[in-house]
């Protein structure tokens, strides 16, 4: 199966601190890749390197079958949507008006606005000022902005932050529908084992900047049938990652 993202010996150091250490990642086309690890494991730093927001100390990144470089950064990023940090908006503007800023900058048709709002189930709140949005609604609007260009690859960092249990389930269903409906490949990072377990096809487990496991989630379940999935993660990471 075609690889959309491949990293080789990807490393990021800040002084003497190694946040990401010789990371080899493989994300296959049309799959949901769960990137799992405890807080501070290096997940966000890795995703920021994939988006060109942080420059690697060493290693290589291949995206869509070609080396990701400074020269092709802009053209590559046109095929990527992302929700990396809690989104912020102009509170005095409506959801549609905030998204209009993105379509103008990215030279996208305004018709995409109504379409993505419908996808994230905010179509009835499109004319509502974002200052009146809950944190969960703002996260969904952030997902809408990431979807505006209908990218080949979607990168989501802790997308269920700020959601109540029903909101978490709704966001999960939204993300799971994207590969089938729109042919997208999705990378989702989380520190919540239960969330990734219900969402991902393939999984990468990172701890202390190193990849501890990578492969099909179903294979991880088969690793040791006498152990719970939570215990397997504990063995791999040295940290409790259950809810």
Tell where the protein language model's regions lie, with residue ranges.
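Helix-to-loop junction immediately C-terminal to a conserved catalytic motif
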Residues: 51
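Helical segment within the ABC ATPase nucleotide-binding domain
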Residues: 168-181
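Conserved ABC transporter NBD signature motif
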Residues: 59-69, 75-76
């Amino acid at each position: 199966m075609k690889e959309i993202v491949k990293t080789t010996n990807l490393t990021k150091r800040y002084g003497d601190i190694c946040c990401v250490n010789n990371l080899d990642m493989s994300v296959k086309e049309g799959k949901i890749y769960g990137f799992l690890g405890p807080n501070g494991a290096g997940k966000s730093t890795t995703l920021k390197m994939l988006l060109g927001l942080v420059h690697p100390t060493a290693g290589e990144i291949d995206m869509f079958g070609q080396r990701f470089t400074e020269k092709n950064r802009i053209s590559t990023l046109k095929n990527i949507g992302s929700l990396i940090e809690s989104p912020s908006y102009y509170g005095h503007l409506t959801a549609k008006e905030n998204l209009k800023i993105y379509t103008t900058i990215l030279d996208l048709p305004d018709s995409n606005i109504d379409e993505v709002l419908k996808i994230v189930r905010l179509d009835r709140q499109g004319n509502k000022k974002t200052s009146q949005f809950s944190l969960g609604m703002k996260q969904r609007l952030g997902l809408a902005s990431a979807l505006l260009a209908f990218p080949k690859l979607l990168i989501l960092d802790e997308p269920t932050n700020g959601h109540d249990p029903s909101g978490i389930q709704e966001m999960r269903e939204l993300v799971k529908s994207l590969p089938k409906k729109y042919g997208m490949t999705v990378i989702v990072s989380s520190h919540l084992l239960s969330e990734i377990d219900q969402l991902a096809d393939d999984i990468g487990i990172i701890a202390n900047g190193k990849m501890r496991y990578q492969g099909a989630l179903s294979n991880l379940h088969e690793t040791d049938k006498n152990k719970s999935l939570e215990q397997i993660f504990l063995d791999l990471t040295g940290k409790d990652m259950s809810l």
